[in-house]
Amino acid sequence: MSSVVSDQMDIESSSAFSPAEPVVDGAFVSKHNLSAEAYQGFKECADSLLSGKIAQNEQLPFIQRTLQICENVILNFEDEKQHLMSDVLLVWAMKQQKLSIATLHTQQLHYKELDLINLQFEYFGELLQQTLSGLDYLKQYYPNVGFEEVHSKVRNLTHYFLYYSIIVSRQPPSVIVKCGEAENHRRSRFWFNTEIRILGGSAFGIDTNNENSNVNCYLITDETAKQLLNNAYLDIFESEEFCIEPNTSTFQKKDARGIKAKFDDMKVAKKVALRRDSVATKRYCLCYNIQLQTNCGIELVGKKVSLPFAVLVGPKADVEAKLFLERSFADLVRHPLSDIPTHVSCAEMADALEMKFQAIIETPQKNTDGPSVVQPRKFNMQTKQHLVMRMKPNNQGFLPLDNFMKLPVAEEFQHKKSASAEGDWKLVPFYDWFFKLAEITNKYLYSMWYDGLVYGFCSKEDAENILRCIPRSVLLVRFSDIEYGKIKISVKNRNGEIRHHWYEHADLNARSLNSELLSNHKFSDVDLIYPDIDLEVALGGRNKPRIRLPRNLAPDEIYFDNQGAAT
């Protein structure tokens, strides 16, 4: 089974972690060239008819030939539209869903891909607009010969294309915790930004006709969202429990990258007093009311709905874990509000865990702190394999998602309230163990993690094998596999002996691990932090013990004369 997992893990990660070179969409170029060639044939025919160059007795067969060319134009347009909608925008949106659990840096890299997509939509939109314009004249000067039907087909294709060019380009987080001023709570997300963006559309005047126009946003339940799937014109009523602020924005065009409506610093406010359990099982969506004008008479009216999320009245880790699985693995773009699958591949889970860990350690400590946009540190292959193996994949290399939520992987000693020395051991499921270590890294080990001084996820046996390969004295900072929320320091001294020390997060709150490694005598004979980082250089140097020097006495004669008085 481990070989199956290894083969899966060797597959290149599908996540966007670093800037990529601009990719030329060869399929789009090919399809667009075919569309442009077909349009050119239509344009030549239209110019001939409208210029009066065709003799009266030749007009009817020429019109029939033009109509046949129009059908070919429509076929090419449909093919290009299908590519842009399915192979480009749908793929982008599905990846957007998966990356919505990742760091702002990773999400921003993906967001920038919309600039190229916007350009592709502009190119296709220009062809559609020019074709519609030509057909407008043809049906006016040559009525009742078939141009009305062609115009209707192209207009419907254009309407569809323009409406689905309106996207939720920035999604809300999977969990919004509404818990007062609990600034220190992990991953509390009081404020977030969303955005509606229109791709292309300049040829139809969408940018000029709708700049500064309002767009309203509503907080709706998933039940209302399900009704919208069947009726896009459904009257929307806000959730009775929460409201969203701000609930209105305006479309703005600040560059040549399309028109956008930004909803910055959004937050959820309670309308009534609520119990945690009353809302923990519910899902909510943001619904944006769209009403846009074009210069060709097409009106774009409808509603755009965000990915679902949970609103919690206070922290609830198991709900956060379930929403992590939903955003990572459910097919919410093609099948809105669909269920989470029962199994996923090891590679998919490894990528999702990596992005979630990166996002948690980038979470601001306080809701007053600004967002951090830095390139995250990647997991190495050993880390990914270690994590997925802890969830016990099956022989085919797939992981039951129930194991993420329910499989015990660690234990925690919980003291009884009545007696501090007594208590019971509690089993901790994978998600709680994993989230806790990410939280500890965020609060106590942030700099060391980014400097590569924390190895991270590693078993005791693997740590010992790793250390034996290093000829000098070395230590390795890792997360405990068995004991909940503990940091382990595995040390190989200069004699080759290996020992392990552990620290609870409360210990790290009292004194940083950096200071502990420099000042504790247990680590005084250690030269390196794994793999070959000089400990003193990395951590700032040890405090050398002060060597007591003999006092330089220079007694005078009076000193010796008085020595007899002392005896």
Swiss-Prot record:
Function (record text): Carries out a dual function: signal transduction and activation of transcription. Required, in concert with transcription factor elt-3, for up-regulation of the vacuolar H(+)-ATPase and acceleration of lysosome maturation at molt. As part of the innate immune response to molting and injury of the adult epidermis, positively regulates the expression of epidermal antimicrobial peptides, such as nlp-29.
GO biological process: cell surface receptor signaling pathway via JAK-STAT; defense response; defense response to fungus; positive regulation of antifungal peptide production; positive regulation of gene expression; regulation of cell population proliferation; regulation of transcription by RNA polymerase II; response to wounding
Domain SH2 residues, every copy: 449-548
Primary subcellular site in the record, as a coarse category: cytoplasm
Listed Gene3D superfamilies: EF-hand, SH2 domain, STAT transcription factor, DNA-binding domain
Designated name of the protein: Signal transducer and activator of transcription b
Keywords, sorted A to Z: Activator, Cytoplasm, Developmental protein, DNA-binding, Nucleus, Phosphoprotein, SH2 domain, Transcription, Transcription regulation
Subunit (UniProt): May interact with sodium-dependent transporter snf-12; the interaction is probably direct.
One Gene Ontology molecular-function label: DNA-binding transcription factor activity, RNA polymerase II-specific
Protein localization: Cytoplasm; Nucleus; Vesicle
GO cellular component: apical part of cell; cytoplasm; endocytic vesicle; hemidesmosome; hemidesmosome associated protein complex; nucleus
